[in-house]
Amino acid sequence: MLKAAAAALYRKNSNFLQGLRLLHKMSDQDLAKIPLVDIDEEGIFKYILIRVTGKETADGTEPSKLVVRGYADCEWHADIYERTQGTIKGTGLDTECLGGGRIEHNPEKKYLKVYGHSTGYGKADHAESKRVLLTKYKNYEIETSDEGY
């Protein structure tokens, strides 16, 4: 009888653990699907740096990555964040805005300038933003500056 109870408990816990592994796998897959960079193709516009985080893994770590978002049609940095949250909603991923600024994007010159700050979210780490932008714009000159709004 004790063996039967132990076997049932093992099966129950095994199924639970398999379910957890599946959730983490789904979370990792969802995280992998989030593009690192989504900015307008040209112009000067506000941008934000966001940390996207998956579910905590069995070893206690939380998989995450930094993403850059910037759109000319968003009047406020908060508008960019809301749009991004809307695209991630329902995936089980969490987001945190780490700050913002502006981007000047000139595709003819293959040039990006990352500068300024967000009044609401503070200044993003422009060096980190540059690192993320380089994943998409490998052959661009990317300048960073703490000057300007």
Curated annotation (Swiss-Prot):
Lineage: superkingdom: Eukaryota
Binding positions (substrate): K46, S118, T119, G120
GO MF annotation terms: protein histidine phosphatase activity
Active site (catalytic residues): H77 (proton acceptor)
Keyword Metal-binding among record annotations: no
SUPFAM superfamilies hit by this protein: PHP14-like (SSF143724)
GO terms classed as biological process: cell differentiation; sex differentiation
GO cellular component, one term: cytosol
Cross-referenced Pfam families: Ocnus
Keywords associated with the record: Differentiation, Sexual differentiation
Chain's role: JanA and janB regulate somatic sex differentiation.
Protein family: Belongs to the janus family.
Protein name according to UniProt: Sex-regulated protein janus-A
